Amino acid sequence: MTDLTKQDFPPLKNDRILKVIKGEEPDKLPIWVMRQAGRYMPKFREFRKLHSFFEICQTPELACEVTLMPIERFDFDAAIIFSDILVIPQALGLEVEMKESVGPVIKNPVTIENLNDLNTEGAADRLNYVGEAITLTRKRLNGKVPLIGFAGAPWTLMGYMIEGGGSKTYSKSKKWLYAHETEAHRLLKILTDVIIDYLILQVKSGAQLLQIFESTNRNAEYLNEYLFDRFCQPYLQRIAIEVKNKIAELKLDVPMILFAKGSHYSLEKQKSLGYDVIGIDWTISPKTVRQILGDQVVQGNLDPCALYASPEGIRAHVDEMIKGFGTGNLVVNLGHGIYPDMSEEAVEIFIDAVHSVKL
């Protein structure tokens, strides 16, 4: 594993996001987009014809190349390493395949009976290829923008690992929460341990921010407040505390973002978990978010479908969103990942609309 403390990376030129998180005023509102290196880009689609999804994730040179695609094409204020939240289940011994038009499929889902078979020893070490991709990308960015690392949150990963992929109900994984609580906590602890080690690996490799996704397929949305408090909150808090403690030991400053899609019921509690930024989906108004979170730094929350609007419409929706949040303590993003059929032109307009806001 590359150790950041022994690296000499180029100085950062665009620190808008980091300034906002520190409470300083940037020259322009910062913006990046979840899945910004993705199928909406023709260049990415051509690249995918040559390489499978996990081949890209597991090959540092390829992951670096894809990560840089949107940075070279657009005026984004951050890059996010090209990877997937399911690399952790892979490291634990699950067989994960990305099927076209289906999404991820896990051939050997976790059950109560095979829980002991997870290969927990050295799991994070088996993800060194992500660290290598981060180091390579950080160098090739040459300080243009900061680089974000990420991981899936424990409940999100648990859902995939038990269901064997995405689900309309998550009934198999929720069954554990009601009928097999001891085993559920055991699996969540296993995942939390690996996530912490994995995030530190990313920091040591050069990640300048970290995002935790409790969001894929609306996983937090499938829980009520009671379940979120018991099966998400303690583990999310432990991740924030332990990762931040280890970052401090490294004498580094790496902010952490929590994005728990569909968890409006827990926004006030999320503020106390120790994350620097709270990600917001598009199904709650910015004004309501500010009433709940006050001056907490937030990230979001344009409806991805707003990018289907006319250029004038996109600008109007951006203005309305920013009016609700205010220009302070805000990192602009979509309320979830960008969709494959969206246009690069719409993304350009989105970015320009954000950067044109007078602070």
Predicted regions span which residues?
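Active-site loop segments of alpha/beta catalytic cores
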Residues: 126-359
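Short glycine/proline- and acidic residue-enriched helix-loop micro-motifs
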Residues: 49-52, 112-122, 177-184
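Exposed alpha-helical structural elements
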Residues: 13-17, 43, 52, 114, ...
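Generic detection of long, well-ordered alpha-helical segments
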Residues: 11, 60-61, 124-127, 185
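A gly/proline- and charged-residue-enriched helix-loop-helix capping module
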Residues: 101-139
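A short acidic, glycine/proline-enriched capping/turn motif at secondary-structure boundaries
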Residues: 85-88, 103-104, 112-113, 154-156
